[in-house]
């Protein structure tokens, strides 16, 4: 294993690696290895930060690897990016390996792509990374068209696999699981890279087209007419929201402290200056899971950014830390928009079911502090969560109407494997087991809203869900006015996010795991069971304001 990479859990009883059963060791004979990175883009975004980081690492430490990007950009051309035609494109690239970075909701629509690739190129190893392989290891490796999965941080792991394919590094591919010729799976431990300074900054050239970035869609919410470049100042989030994939990852990390990793502020600003000047960047979007995970870093960063960068930017934040001083400091540094999650307008439901313990007054105060500082507000809200009632949804709408953020955004709940809320949904029999093709954000475009779980008429009927979502959509179209020009009123135009189709199915009938994170939620449900004969009627009462 790379000495710079720690492991999440050290195995003491791992069997010796049966190298004679590896189909891929020393399989690449030519001098230069051709590696294709891929990701699924159903929303139009064409930047993937994990790929940018792995590409930079490969280009620095393995110059004999040709790094190629061929993303699945289905919004650009559905026919060109169909599974059959995409596989033909990969065949034309003459690749030695293809590595997909996949989010969990995109797993099912991507499976036909793996199948078509293996039909055309049975000797091309397929590697899966991203949250899908980190959270759903067994489901991912069991796909007959998958050869390796990356189960942790991917930079050193991708370096290990290219050496494996060239026969330069005997032994297993540390940081990955490998499917052997006899069908057995050889497992290694996930990598956690604690020292980000040991890695190069992400490589954006991998996303450029023939005309540079003129035709690269790098942002969904950012301004048009300038290059909006997504950047990250670190990795990790200290919070344990029950619906978020970060929570099970945090639970497996060695310590909470090492899970939160930041670049040095001076180094980060120097990199932003380089990017600004190299690509003529007009706006930075900070894609950190939580920009404020280290307040000491934030204070230092804002001061240096203000002095050296002089570009507007947006960040993700939490209402608990958005006091007057913070918002004013952020505004002085150039912060244009703060994205923050409200998720639900019902305080009790939000705390007990979603793990978000802020009060509505904190939400209102944070929004007011932003407005006073001249910062735009973009709110995230989830609808259709397990055991949510119609009244819960109405409270979400009312709270946002009271705030009147510059951009109101709502989306259907997505059950993510391994998360506490997924486990509760599964335990209560709410997961859809047969229907794979669902919509994520495209519902707003289609004017048709359907639950991503089974209907609970005692709590929220399908008709009520559609009706309230339509009310939210009407508010969104009347309210949203996010502007990127100074002193110029924005053109009024209905907010529209391109299709984000995704698939959701739970083929695993095994019982949900009961992690420690489930206990607060299960306690709430247990109370309901005691108080009411009907779970759903009880939850209606428990979370009703």
Regions found by a protein language model. Give the residues of each.
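Structural motif
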Residues: 34, 96-97, 283
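Glycine-rich beta-alpha loop elements in corrinoid/cobalamin-binding modules
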Residues: 57-61, 65-193, 412-418
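Short hydrophobic segments within beta-strands
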Residues: 36-41, 70, 101, 129, ...
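Conserved strand-turn element in the central/C-terminal portion of the radical SAM core barrel
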Residues: 77, 290, 318, 345-355, ...
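A short, glycine/small-residue-rich beta-strand->loop->alpha-helix junction that serves as a flexible
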Residues: 41-49, 102-107
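Catalytic cores of alpha/beta
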Residues: 139-142, 326, 387-401
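Radical SAM [4Fe-4S] cluster-binding motif and immediate context
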Residues: 197, 204-380, 398
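C-terminal accessory regions of radical SAM enzymes
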Residues: 2-45, 177-181, 185, 192, ...
């Amino acid at each position: 294993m790379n000495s710079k990479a720690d492991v999440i859990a050290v195995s003491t009883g791992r069997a010796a690696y049966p190298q004679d059963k590896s189909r891929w060791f020393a399989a690449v004979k030519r001098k230069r290895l051709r590696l294709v990175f891929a990701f699924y883009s159903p929303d139009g975004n064409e930047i993937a930060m994990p790929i940018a980081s792995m590409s930079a690492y490969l280009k620095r430490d393995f110059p004999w690897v040709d790094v190629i990007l061929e993303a699945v950009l289905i919004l650009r051309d559905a026919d060109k990016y169909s599974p059959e035609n995409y596989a033909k494109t990969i065949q034309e690239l003459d690749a030695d390996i293809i590595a997909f970075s996949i989010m969990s909701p995109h797993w099912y629509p991507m499976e036909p792509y793996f199948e078509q690739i293996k039909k055309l190129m049975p000797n091309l190893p397929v590697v899966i990374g991203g949250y899908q392989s980190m959270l759903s290891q067994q489901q991912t490796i069991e796909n007959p068209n998958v050869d390796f999965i990356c189960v942790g941080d991917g930079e050193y792991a991708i370096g290990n696999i290219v050496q494996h394919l060239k026969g330069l590094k005997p032994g297993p591919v540390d940081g990955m699981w490998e499917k052997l010729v006899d069908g057995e799976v050889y497992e290694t431990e996930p990598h956690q890279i604690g020292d980000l300074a040991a890695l190069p900054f992400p490589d954006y050239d991998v996303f450029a087209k023939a005309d540079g970035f003129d035709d690269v869609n790098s942002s969904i919410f950012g301004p048009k007419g300038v290059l909006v470049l997504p950047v990250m100042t670190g990795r990790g989030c200290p919070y344990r929201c029950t619906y978020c994939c970060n929570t099970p990852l945090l639970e497996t990390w060695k310590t909470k402290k090492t899970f939160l990793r930041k670049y040095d502020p001076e180094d980060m600003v120097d990199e932003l200056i380089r990017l600004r000047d190299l690509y003529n960047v007009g706006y930075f979007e900070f894609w950190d899971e939580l920009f404020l995970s280290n307040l000491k870093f934030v204070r230092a960063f804002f001061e240096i950014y203000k002095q050296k960068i002089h570009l507007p930017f947006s960040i993700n934040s939490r209402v608990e830390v958005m006091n007057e001083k913070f918002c004013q400091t952020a505004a002085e540094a150039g912060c244009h928009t703060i994205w923050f999650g409200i998720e639900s307008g019902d305080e009790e439901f939000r705390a007990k079911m979603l793990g978000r313990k802020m009060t509505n007054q904190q939400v209102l105060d944070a929004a007011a502090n932003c407005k006073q500082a001249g910062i735009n507000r973009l709110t995230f809200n989830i609808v259709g969560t397990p055991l949510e009632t119609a009244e819960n949804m109405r409270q979400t709408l009312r709270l946002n109407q009271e705030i009147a953020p510059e951009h109101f955004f709502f989306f259907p709940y997505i059950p993510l494997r391994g998360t506490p809320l997924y486990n509760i949904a599964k335990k209560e029999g709410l997961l859809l087991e047969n229907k794979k093709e669902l919509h994520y954000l495209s519902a707003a475009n289609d004017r048709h809203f359907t639950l991503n779980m089974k209907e609970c008429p005692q709590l929220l009927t399908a008709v009520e869900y559609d009706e309230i979502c339509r009310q939210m959509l009407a508010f969104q179209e009347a309210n949203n006015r996010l502007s990127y020009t100074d002193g110029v009123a924005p053109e009024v135009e209905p907010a529209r996010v391109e299709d984000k189709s995704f698939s959701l199915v739970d083929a695993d009938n095994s019982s949900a795991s009961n992690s420690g994170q489930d206990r607060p939620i299960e306690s709430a449900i247990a109370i309901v069971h005691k108080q009411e004969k009907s779970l759903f009627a009880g939850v209606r009462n428990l979370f009703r304001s």
